Amino acid sequence: MTKNRLHTIEAVTNGIWLALIESYPKLVRFDAPKIVLCNRLTRTAGKNYQEENRIHLGNKFFLNNHSAMMLEILPHEIAHQADFNLFGLSEKRCGHGKKWCEIMVKLGLPANKYHSLTI
């Protein structure tokens, strides 16, 4: 089941990444982030490791929140990776800064910092 789930998540990730490339052509130089399902995430639904181009998603959250994970959490984390690839890190910017918010708007999503999902 996890292998099928991961395949689906990777397909959605690639679709989101391609949509972002249309808005931000510079992203074509970067691969879509690699997705890892992680059983260790119990409070955080997703975590982006920007320099490794990798996103960890809480596997346990999928049991009760599959749609929200695919429609909210995954794009949220992909937006972090796109923000990093396009604009880099800045001590003056937090992870949910203006550029990240703009990317979320391009995805047609609210720029929420936190989730309310339960395991």
Please describe what each predicted stretch is.
Residues 1-72, 81-119:
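Active-site-proximal or metal-binding-adjacent scaffold patches in catalytic folds
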